[in-house]
Amino acid sequence: MAAAAPSSVTDFSESDNAGISREHWKIMLISGMGFFTDAYDLFIIGVVMALLKPEWHVGKLEEGLVQSTALIAAAIGALLFGRVADMLGRKRIYGVEVLVLAAGAIASALSPNIWWLIGFRFILGIGIGGDYPVSATIMSEYAGKAHRGMLVSMVFAMQAAGLIVGPLLAALLLTTPLSHDWIWRILIAFGALPALAVYAARRRLKETPRFLKAAAQEEDASGNLQRASHFDQKTHSVSFWDGFHRLVDDKKTLVRLLGAAGAWFLMDFAYYGNTVSSPLVLSALSGDHTILAKTLTQLGIFVIFAAPGYALAALTMDKLGRKTIQILGFGMMAVTFGLLALIPNVEQLFYPFLIIYGLSYFFTEFGPNATTFVYPSEIFPVRVRTTGHGIAAAMGKLGGFVGVFTFPFFMSWNGLAAAEGAAAIVSVLGLGVTAFMLPETKGKSLEELSEQPETPVERAVA
């Protein structure tokens, strides 16, 4: 079955060529709050486990499950919410994911034992995963082609705030007389607040004109934000599995799906393993480090290296292009991870270690962590856009699951060299996937992207 024919490129020419408006900034902020919680939780769960292990006598299996269960659930959430948003519309589903996320965070904070915590983190993960395809696609479908990359990447860049607030709040709480039991519960519960804060605003957002047009609505939806608020579900009834079939039946679309999903899987393997296991990595520097000292060190790394990487990615996304940034990022990740793996006793060289480790964060953010989020919001036809993004995000979370679950075992097997060596290898693979399977999308409308020149792999399978 061939992919759906693209709409005329003139249908949305006015909105495609428009500048950035207040409406765009509002949508960006509303869409980004879920990613604050995503990154916040990604960091603080490492701190939480450091606090819980001596109190609950947590073994390696339980530790791995606590840190990785939310990632498996996020894969399910991305698939589910992504498909439903293509079936019923972005508006109908938007906001439900943050309620699920908040419920999971609050319930996790009330957990009486490790197994309840694992179960509630599964609920949290469903909400986190559901946010990926819907938020990215809403921002992409509203943005003009000249600024789309920046706006979508800025939605994702809200992670930077979560990565900074997480260790900052943890450090503040660790200086108080509160018990560790109270501290970890407060840390987890706090993640629900940003998500709940944008629930009402998400429910008020109007349906994207591109979805209305593709769903063959009777109203004119060519870029008019004010009128793009209603659509009749009865006019669009499709099978849940229809979108998946449309993605895999067209060879060109399938190659792009494999490229986007493969690159995201490889990136998240390295990224999540490194970030969630950061207390283990920093312990390699000094066995005497307290939880507070390691938390402050991680905060410094995020502020100095990760946050500028997010910012630079957003500012250059529409200038350098997605493909250039992703190839550069994967390449430099391979170099930095490789240095950490190959330099003898690198963990004993405090400042060189921190600089190299920090640069790995910088080029992850100014690299595939941003672009793997942007790509799937652009390269698929509108009727399967959130479905495609959901599949790619799910593969990313699956890669994160593998990284989180295996990273501690790499560390215990052969120390830092094994863990960082594995991250370097998958970074090289990610570079190859990007170079041969993904197109450049900068400066093109979403409708044009269905007709742009093929990649080498797309030509080979045509």
Task: Identify the meaning behind each predicted range.
Residues 1-462:
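Transmembrane-helix signature of 12-pass secondary carriers
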